[in-house]
Amino acid sequence: MGNSEKSTFIEKSTSCKKTILTVENIQAFYGEKNVLQDINLKFTEKSFTCLIGPNGSGKSTLLNVLCGINNPSLDITNGKVFLKSQDIKKIPKKEIAKEISFLPQSEMYSWNHLVLDVVMMGRFPYSKGFFGYTKEDTEIAEKALAECDILHLKDRYIFELSGGEYQQVLIARSLCQETKILVLDEPFTHLDISKQHKLLLLLKKLVAEKNLCVIITLHEVNQAAIYGENLILLKEGKILSTGDVKTVFTKENLENAYETDFGFFQHPEFLVPQVFPR
C-alpha cells in the first residue's frame, strides 16, 4: 500500500471493531523540515499496532501528535487528530489522560521517589484534588507492578534501580492509568530479551482481554513481525506501507525504508518473515 492511498489498514483487518483514534491529513514541520507528510490513520479498540522505520523517520513525532502533546517547536500546518470523534485539541489534558496513556522514549525523574509512588502517578487523572489516592488506586498500582513482575520492587527508590527495572516501573505506571489506548515509544530499550518477550505477551493479553488499543514503536523489526497485528512503516515522515505483516514486511519495503540489503527467512514457530542485514 503506497503513501498516496488512505491508510485504512485497520478497518480492513478489523472492520467490526470500533474506531477510537483517527489521524486525518497531518502535516507537521520542525522549522523548514517537513517531519510528517499526509498522515492518515485509523486505530480501533482491541488492536496491536507496531510502528517501525529508521532513525529520524518520524515515529516519535507521530506518537506525540497522536496523544495531543503540545510541542512548541512542532508546527502542525494541516490536519487533525480525533479521539472518539472529538478533536483532540479541544479535549482537556486530564480527560485525554483518562483515554490515552503515553510513555515517551526517555523519561527521568529528578526526585528519588519510591517505586510504588511513581506507579501511583498513573492514577492522577482520577484523583480528586486534596483527597489524593484511594485504597483502590493502591490496589490498581500493585496489580500493575505484579503484571510487570516487579511487585517486589515497590518499596525501593528509583535511583537504586537498574535501567531495565526502571523501564519496567514506567510501563507499570502506564498500565496503572487504565486507559483504553496505550502508546509506548521504544519501551524496551534497557530490557533483556526475556523481559521484552514477557511484556509483549502481557500487552497482547491485555489487548485480547480488555479490548485495548496498543500503539508501540519498535526498533527491532523482527519483534514487530512476530507480535504486531498491524504494522506502520515510516520513512522521512511518510507512510511507506501499512497493513498486516504479509503486506508490510516485504523485501522491497524494508530495503527501501532502511536502505540496506536484507536476507529473509521464516520464523520456525510463528511462521512470519524475519530479516537479517547482509
Explain the meaning of each model-derived region.
Residues 132, 157-161, 165:
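Conserved ABC ATPase signature
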Residues 182-186:
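Catalytic Walker B motif of ABC-type/P-loop ATPase nucleotide-binding domains
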Residues 52-54:
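The feature captures the beta-strand-to-loop junction immediately N-terminal to the Walker
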Residues 21, 36-38:
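Conserved structural motif at the start of ABC-family nucleotide-binding domains
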Residues 67:
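Helix-to-loop junction immediately C-terminal to a conserved catalytic motif
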Residues 75-86:
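Conserved ABC transporter NBD signature motif
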Residues 120, 135-153, 178:
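Conserved ABC ATPase "signature" region
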